[in-house]
Swiss-Prot record:
The gene is PDS5E. Disulfide bonds: none annotated. It comes from Arabidopsis thaliana (Mouse-ear cress). A motif (Nuclear localization signal 3) lies at residues 583-590. GO terms for cellular component: nucleus; plasmodesma. Disruption phenotype: Weak impact on meiosis such as formation of some chromosome bridges at late anaphase I and telophase I in forming pollen, but severe effects on development, fertility, somatic homologous recombination (HR) and DNA repair, especially in plants lacking PDS5A, PDS5B, PDS5C, PDS5D and PDS5E. InterPro entries: ARM-type_fold, Pds5. A motif (Nuclear localization signal 1) lies at residues 458-465. Residues 302-314, 727-742 have a biased composition (Basic residues). CDD domains: Tudor_Agenet_AtEML-like. This is Sister chromatid cohesion protein PDS5 homolog E.
Amino acid sequence: MGPLVEATEFSKEQALTDAAENLLKPHFSTDATLSLLEVMESLLATVEQDLSSSVQKALHPPMRALVSADLLRNPDSDVRVSVVSCLTEIMRITAPEAPYNDEQMKDIFQVTIEAFEKLADASSRSYRKAEVILETVAKVRSSLVMLDLECDDLVLEMFQRFLKIIRPDHPQLVLVSMETIMITVIDESEEVPMDLLEILLTTVKKDSQDVSPAALTLVEKVLSSCTCKLQPCIMEALKSSGTSLDMYSPVVSSICQSEFATTQAHNDVKPKDNEADEKISEGQVVPSDSLEDKLNLGLSRKGTRSKRSARGGTRRANGDEKVITANEGLSESTDAETASGSTRKRGWKPKSLMNPEEGYSFKTSSSKKVQEKELGDSSLGKVAAKKVPLPSKVGQTNQSVVISLSSSGRARTGSRKRSRTKMEETDHDVSSVATQPAKKQTVKKTNPAKEDLTKSNVKKHEDGIKTGKSSKKEKADNGLAKTSAKKPLAETMMVKPSGKKLVHSDAKKKNSEGASMDTPIPQSSKSKKKDSRATTPATKKSEQAPKSHPKMKRIAGEEVESNTNELGEELVGKRVNVWWPLDKKFYEGVIKSYCRVKKMHQVTYSDGDVEELNLKKERFKIIEDKSSASEDKEDDLLESTPLSAFIQREKSKKRKIVSKNVEPSSSPEVRSSMQTMKKKDSVTDSIKQTKRTKGALKAVSNEPESTTGKNLKSLKKLNGEPDKTRGRTGKKQKVTQAMHRKIEKDCDEQEDLETKDEEDSLKLGKESDAEPDRMEDHQELPENHNVETKTDGEEQEAAKEPTAESKTNGEEPNAEPETDGKEHKSLKEPNAEPKSDGEEQEAAKEPNAELKTDGENQEAAKELTAERKTDEEEHKVADEVEQKSQKETNVEPEAEGEEQKSVEEPNAEPKTKVEEKESAKEQTADTKLIEKEDMSKTKGEEIDKETYSSIPETGKVGNEAEEDDQRVIKELEEESDKAEVSTTVLEVDP
């Protein structure tokens, strides 16, 4: 069987070559030429699309011979018809690629349209050939190439010839082929030109005299099939001409009235009414049985049909595809004409990508303009791999594949764009075709009867060409996004559930065999949103509520629509949510304007997309702007709320912050910090009580007998009696315990005054680290208080140590704590004397000199030694103090921060030059005594004895003053015994 096939192929190749050579020879007889053309036509009819390299090579000479001037421009019409018959076979073989360049294709189409004239006379010699030509043009959809080549005049001429030559006695195949060609051209045009529309309307006009019934029937079928496309054009034409619907055939009235019926159906949301409207608008179609009889949609032996590549209105270069040319040198070219992606300027051209099974691509041989001067096997070698066989004429009865009436619909349902959307990128090199807003208002709707016919005959093929519709994606670039969010992935309405790839038309899927179009090209977000609104036939069947509205094909929801009476200028400026059926979601936009003539609203979506919609036919929601109302309410609330309420609210928030940072935690650090705070508060209260005590003792300190108190103080320091110390401590603890009850109240007062922020809480954490040091300080504080709260000893100490006291008085105005950070100093120094750390320790150690360590006793001894050396100077100072104390008795305290200063001022001696020198001497003496550590105990005992003896000399006071001092000392001793227990508890308290 193998050798026989090879022999057959070889003989076919040889026959094609011989026939081409014979045609190129000059012939003096028309009959001889016709005979050679008959042989050529029969040979070409046996060639399938799946070409071998040898057949491709053998096909080249016939292609060159058929476009020669002697044959294509032969004076005999029968010869020209025979040539066209051969050329249509070549177009079938090379589909979806155009076999010649643009100029040659235009010449071929011109001759083809002339050949249709032979259909007017059934008795003519070329009538049968004309029928075959018409059938082939319809099935391979070569009329789309005419649109791509901008052959507008040829299209108009073809329509006129069809209406002129059609006869009632024509076979149904002729009528259906004419109808198919006309519907294909209208549906695939971006905008139906007025000249073409005028031809159709003139035919269906009632007063037309020269229109045959067959032509009227043909036009009515075309109008009914293209209702969605022609409806707005017809309405506009009638308005511009001012003619009435009564002047035209009832089909025109039904087309125009279907718009109102559709509007009512959408507004009422009644699916049954929508179905009825669909029947009205699309019911006038050719009976399906006649189509099945005359159009056999059987598949070829390979189960595939001829296909065409997607072009989208612009020609592109494809280096992998070789197109056979027959221009004397048989040129092979790439797309040098529109390499820059320039688009055609005409407004009438194929609307979209076409389905490859249904005929030619928009790509023609003119896109390949590089002349081929060498013929090689490669000139035809790559064509066969890309062609899907169409049936040959050998034994062709019901095997011929004729283009279905739904082919244009299938092309639209695939990757072709909707009529009211802009052409977007759908392939590597395809440029977008700019369309006017007026061109974006309708979408093709496939006739249901034809759709059923198509699916019944090519069911297997349909299973593989479900085309996907991608859903709208919101913009994620340019930082807008305002959305950040976030973006829905592209949905597809395919049989396969995958929703992440954009599936183009079957043209691209089949062209991917050996070509570079096997990878889906992602579309822009705008094209995805717009494509998602196009409804495929499969989608229509899946919808529960089919609608006849040709423009939107929206799914009617159950929600309440807006009042149709208010869908005018009242909506301008309002924000709306518009329903997109394939995305199954609403998209937000703003109504920018309203056209009274078109009754269309211009909606600008949040992603920048602009669309003109008839909102009476749309499903949408008006978005109420509640933000302004809420803002006004908030402003009113702010204005009506008093300032005190906000302050109180802020305080409560800060309290909560402090409680969150302290209370929930049970760690030792937090507990210790809380104890530190409580102790700090108790010490603060003790400070206040000390001030009150000093105020009560002010009268005593103002007496001239203050020197007696000074002597008593020195005596207490020398003796260092523990009992007296404990008595003073017990008295102080008594006051402290009384003030503990007010801790919580004082804490609240401190919060209100200080309004601590988060930094204070952090400081509190840091203070907890230094808790051990503070604990020691707090344990020593009661003794410190005792030193400071001695009845009048503190005030009289200035007479004994004038330099130190004067220095203290000079610094006292700044003694009050200024910041929280300095608060711990004020706690250590109840009288707020700004002493250094060393001075604080010395002040705390002085009352308990004998109870401290040996080193502390040495320091106390050294200090007393320094006092002894300046004993004579102290006598002088004491006299001066007595004189000035009487003058300063009536001095009132100036401020709370200076209260301590006013208490000590009566006994204080202002610093003079002599005192400054004495202070310097005293400091020098102290420094020297510190270095003498070996004299600690011995000198201390001697100093004690000498001090006892010196008391009578310096303690010359009245009897009344001595009695008062003794009474105070006695009271302190009694209280010391009672407070001994509480003192022990305070020292042990953690």
